[in-house]
Amino acid sequence: MKKNTLMAMIMAICLSVASLAMAADTIPVGVPIPMTGWAAGSGADYFKGIKMAIDELNETGGVLGKQLEIFRFDSKGFEPEVVMQAADYLCGQKKVAAVFAGWAGWGQDVTAYGKYDAPFFADDGSQAAVDVFRTDPEKYYNIYQMTPTGPGQAISMFRALTNLPYKYPNKKLVIINTDDSWGLEIKDTIAKNFKKIGWKVAKQETVPYGTNEWGIILSRVRRIKPALIHFEIASGQENITFIQQFLKKPTNTIVSIGWGITPREVVDNLGTTADGIIGEMPAGLPAPKAPNAAGQAWVDKFVSLYKHQIPAGSWIFYTAVKAWAHAAEQVGDAFDFKAVNKYLQENGYEGHQGLMKWDKDNVMRAQPASPVVHYQVQKGELSPIFTDPPLTPYPHGKFIKPRWIK
């Protein structure tokens, strides 16, 4: 009996030691992205880039000789309590070395992950998130925004829309946006800049996420006959239904849907029906024809893996993983968070399009190595027409007047 008990104890100790040894051979990383709910489509787009980068690293020896292990958490609709639960689970319990979150909120994520020191990479695109960071930069030093804020993206949209090789029939603008900080920031910036050049905001509608019946708004739009509609809702389904209903009785109007053009579900659902629609992808790699050989190799591999062109978030979060891995390798310890964060802030990362760096707010503003890419849907796919900064016509694409404009 004693022998059996002793043997059981020895086996338990051996299993525990083996488990610890296995754990020591991996580096955990957190991926809190929406897997259910209204943001699940864009969450899947982010995950494709994250997984592609992690698979590449693991196939070539991992980071510092250790394989990366992904721990996921469903961040759903970024409710503050869910975001806090994710941070406590990933950083508090799983002790991850880094977190790759994609769109993660509009400031609640900064508060949640700022309690810890592991580098946290987000795509909030929100001035509200930056404002939280600015309340205590030393505390939130581990928070990295991978794209420009809403106002920065809206300025780029304004530049693109006012430089189309197209003569607007009038100077009437309609803006439709969501009621979150993202939608309001875009609306305010677009309206202010168009008013400066003599345009009139003929109608502005703020709506909640989940709005899919556009009949009343569109009936008013058809009476106004605006030269331009800017529609800004960072969720695929609302963009799909708006375009479908607009095209039932279109006006001679350029339709811009901003960030909403780039979730993969939008072009997958609409196909060639969306031809002529304009939008933008912040922090993008132009495709299907990339600007250089390194970028083209990446595009070709992505398309080979996922059987479609690049959606929003995939390339920039592939890059976030590679930037963190490079910093960890240079420091020599993925868990020396102070040193890894210092390396990222001081050195940035050499990506497919050049050196990318964060500013004093840890925001990756629009820059040549991480440009805003402006697209038009053509033949059911995204075709780049401008990159910014500086705003430049893309050499492998051109604007085509939408078929519904007579």
Region annotations inferred by a language model:
Residues 96-204, 254-279:
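Extracytoplasmic ligand/sensor domains, especially the bilobed periplasmic-binding protein
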